[in-house]
Design a protein with these regions (language model features):
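Structural motif
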Residues: 49-51, 58, 74, 95
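Conserved short histidine dyad/triad with adjacent acidic residue
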Residues: 20-37
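Short acidic-glycine-tyrosine-enriched beta hairpin
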Residues: 56-71
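Tight coil/turn sites that cap or link beta-strands
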Residues: 28-29, 64, 72, 92-94
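A generic fold-level signal
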Residues: 13-15, 37, 53, 61, ...
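Short, conserved beta-strand element in jelly-roll/cupin
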Residues: 35-53, 68
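A hydrophobic/aromatic-rich effector-binding and dimerization subdomain
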Residues: 1-19, 74-126
Length: 126
């Protein structure tokens, strides 16, 4: 992982390390250059078209599409239409973990946190 591409911006506050970005960008503009961070990120497409790349895999986002970017995955976004708008929700994966050692924690959440598993990037409703 290239250290120089690590995003160092603090997300939210110490008490609430969640940041929601309302993104509206010019077509063809590089809205978010390639970077990675320790947090998980959810992108929710609202309008227009977005070109995004996650770990060298290209995706096209359209209204209603949801993308999950795992912690430490290299990613970047670029508007592909004049009316491109999306929400980017950045949060620590630990928010999904519980203090209990239950089956969901052991089989699903801990492997995500330890990078032994990952959530697929494009979440399809069907």
């Amino acid at each position: 992982m290239k250290r120089e591409l690590e995003e160092t911006r603090r997300q939210g506050t110490a008490m609430r390390p969640l940041q929601v970005y309302h993104m509206r960008c010019d077509p063809g503009a590089i809205d978010v250059p390639f970077h990675w961070h320790e947090n998980a990120e959810i992108l929710l497409m609202q309008t227009g078209t977005l070109a995004l790349q996650v770990e060298a895999v290209p995706f096209t986002g359209r209204p209603g599409d949801v993308f999950f970017i795992n912690p430490r995955e290299l990613h970047g976004m670029q508007s592909a239409s004049a009316d491109c708008a999306y929400l980017a929700i950045v949060f620590p994966l630990s928010w999904l973990q519980f203090a209990l050692a239950d089956e969901a924690e052991e089989n699903c959440l801990r492997p995500l946190a330890d990078r032994r598993a990952r959530v697929t990037t494009r979440l399809d409703p069907a």
